[in-house]
Amino acid sequence: MSIDRKKVEEHIRGLLVAIGENPDREGLKETPSRVAQMYQEVFEGISYTNDEIAEMFNKTFEEDLVIPKDNKEIVLVKDIDIFSYCEHHMALMYNMKVAVAYIPNDKILGLSKIARIADMVGKRLQLQERIGSDIAEIMQKITDSEDVAVIVEGQHACMTTRGIKNTGSRTTTTTLRGAFKTDTNLTNRLMMLYK
């Protein structure tokens, strides 16, 4: 599903009128078009399913890779910067850092692809918890590894700029799959690497 820029422009113009603004004044004349263009970029991930994202970034390396059957070595990419928008208020989720870990099975994924997956998943109306589970699902599909962990930290404008207005709060969510969920020693190793 692609974004209907024309409809977005019409609705943004209507929203400006509804909040008491004049959409024809100098500073707002191009706002509906600018917002539509911005939404096309920041909500790009809405256009793709998790399967399509997995296919898009499925660049694995298998040649010259010798992985023992009992492998418990962790690949961790952390401090991946993303942003998203809360699906409840359409408010920005910002200062987000994502960490993605997996235990290679028969494939390793190009590291930049992990960051691209996190970025694309964030470009949807989201819940922070779902960002983690979507990334984990995509990683499992690409790597054929059940052992995936995702940690997401971020701030939510729906908490910092409205309601309670708690500007210092950060939310951390974890998604643990496979051995990361069942093996306490492995989970502890992950958390030590994550710090």
Swiss-Prot record:
Q: Would the keyword rRNA-binding be found if you checked this record's keyword annotation?
A: no
**Which Gene3D superfamilies does its entry note?**
1.10.286.10, 3.30.1130.10
Q: In which pathway does it act?
A: Cofactor biosynthesis; 7,8-dihydroneopterin triphosphate biosynthesis; 7,8-dihydroneopterin triphosphate from GTP: step 1/1
Catalysed reactions listed for this entry: GTP + H2O = 7,8-dihydroneopterin 3'-triphosphate + formate + H(+)
Stored SUPFAM superfamilies: Tetrahydrobiopterin biosynthesis enzymes-like (SSF55620)
Return any one Pfam family short name: GTP_cyclohydroI
Question: EC?
Answer: 3.5.4.16
Q: What are the recorded GO MF terms, alphabetically?
A: GTP binding; GTP cyclohydrolase I activity; zinc ion binding
Return the similarity comment. Belongs to the GTP cyclohydrolase I family.
Q: What is this protein called?
A: GTP cyclohydrolase 1
**What is the scientific name of the source organism?**
Ruminiclostridium cellulolyticum (strain ATCC 35319 / DSM 5812 / JCM 6584 / H10)
Q: Which gene encodes it?
A: folE
